[in-house]
Amino acid sequence: MSISIRPDEISSIIQQQIEQYDQEVKVANVGTVLQVGDGIARIYGLEKAMAGELLEFEDGTVGIAQNLEEDNVGAVLMGEGREIQEGSTVTATGRIAQIGVGEALIGRVVDALGRAIDGKGDIKASESRLIESPAPGIIARRSVHEPMQTGITAIDSMIPIGRGQRELIIGDRQTGKTAIAIDTIINQKGEDVVCVYVAIGQKASTVANVVQTLQEKGAMDYTVVVAAGASEPATLQFLAPYTGATIAEYFMYKGKATLVIYDDLSKQAQAYRQMSLLLRRPPGREAYPGDVFYIHSRLLERAAKLSDELGKGSMTALPIIETQAGDVSAYIPTNVISITDGQIFLSSDLFNAGIRPAVNPGISVSRVGSAAQTKAMKKVAGKIKLELAQFDDLQAFAQFASDLDKATQDQLARGQRLRELLKQSQNQPLSVAEQVAILYAGINGYLDDIPVDKVTTFTKGLRDYLKSGVNPYFQDVQSKKTLGDDEEKALKAALDDYKKTFKATA
């Protein structure tokens, strides 16, 4: 008996099988490791890799595609990568580096990828943001007009900083750069400002000290610490500042004021130089790659004061740069000076002479901050920079001149007292009312008959006297931030009263 198969039956069976076929075809962009070492991997394949794309290695290590060359891809590793070998498989993820952000980050210490490193458990992020985000455009911004008080009299009076400004802190090692940044964070208590402190390439013990100081002062309640220590791969040290900016950006677009400190960008540039040289990119001046300016400009341009339509948020950036023997004309210092809206220059000579904070008012400048200075401070601080500059000139001249006229002697005496009252202890920021009172006393001659070595005692006593509430001045200036006729009259009365008691007890 012959079996006859009809063609239409065959076609219907095939059609049925085709319709039931549901196996998914997975297309993956895969490559093979050609060479690995020093935190760099060269990979064959990955034809469709994007610049900056995250790559996943066999052992779970993540890398970033940096060099897209004709026959291979150069990638930097974001981990030790000890298990990666020649011939290992690499898969392109199709994603760009991003981190989790949200309120849960406040009070925590995280690494450059936003992972908790403080032993307090995982962080439940509310959303993800790209580490490399575009900076706000021209229309999205408005000019800097609100003060960002550092609590340091020398800075708030002569080099004022506004919300949304980029102000560089520059100086040799051990001149108090980090101390100024930490004081500024401590001074934001009660101001509804979210602070982000980014430690790049620092010793773990140094970062632990900073966190401890912030905890003791109650500042970790509004601060996030991003740490990429000296033992971390260069890739993470390079990424850490962008992570800090991304965390601050989340709060900025929610309408909050934020403050980011990058401590310090010299080490970030060195990490980028290391990555670039190992990737065989051509070196330029001081062996830095040609785009080292761009890594800092795209970071610092993300700091802004947003327009009213975007919620009035702000990101103030205080980048720190370390100089070698006071040389501000080196490559990285000049780059960052040209990007920022001013610089606070700390001098090792002043520091060693006991003038702390060691701010050099001669070459320090704030290009936009004066528009943000409080009215009370503007009224008293106008003359101080000029007086100190003239004092420096006279002091140099007085070393050679034996007989000085009375006016010159008086000006020298006034200058010495002004310099003395600008001295301030670490981790003790002052309120606006305290700063205004001290400066007013110095400029209007209340200290002229006080011995130079007693000026610090006088100013401390004056601050305590004003805060005791005997006089209405302190509360009025603290709330209004102006120094009107009534406040000035109250301040004069307070100064006269306190000076009498000080002279009687001295």
Swiss-Prot record:
GO cellular component: plasma membrane-derived thylakoid membrane; proton-transporting ATP synthase complex
Biological function: Produces ATP from ADP in the presence of a proton gradient across the membrane. The alpha chain is a regulatory subunit.
Membrane topology qualifier: Peripheral membrane protein
Matching InterPro entries: ATP_synth_asu-like_sf (IPR023366), ATP_synth_asu_C (IPR000793), ATP_synth_asu_C_sf (IPR038376), ATP_synth_F1_a_nt-bd_dom (IPR033732), ATP_synth_F1_asu (IPR005294), ATPase_a/bsu_AS (IPR020003), ATPase_F1/V1/A1_a/bsu_N (IPR004100), ATPase_F1/V1/A1_a/bsu_N_sf (IPR036121)
List of residues binding ATP: 171-178
One GO molecular-function entry: proton-transporting ATP synthase activity, rotational mechanism
Signal peptide range: none
Name recorded for this polypeptide: ATP synthase subunit alpha
Family according to the record: Belongs to the ATPase alpha/beta chains family.
Organism whose genome encodes this protein: Trichormus variabilis (strain ATCC 29413 / PCC 7937) (Anabaena variabilis)
Native organism taxonomy: Bacteria, Bacillati, Cyanobacteriota, Cyanophyceae, Nostocales
Oligomeric form and interacting partners: F-type ATPases have 2 components, CF(1) - the catalytic core - and CF(0) - the membrane proton channel. CF(1) has five subunits: alpha(3), beta(3), gamma(1), delta(1), epsilon(1). CF(0) has four main subunits: a(1), b(1), b'(1) and c(9-12).
Primary residence: membrane
Catalytic reactions of this protein: ATP + H2O + 4 H(+)(in) = ADP + phosphate + 5 H(+)(out)
Gene label: atpA
The EC number(s) this enzyme carries: 7.1.2.2
Site (Required for activity): 364
Signal in keyword set: no
Localization: Cellular thylakoid membrane
Disulfide bonds: none
Keywords, ordered alphabetically: ATP synthesis, ATP-binding, CF(1), Hydrogen ion transport, Ion transport, Membrane, Nucleotide-binding, Thylakoid, Translocase, Transport
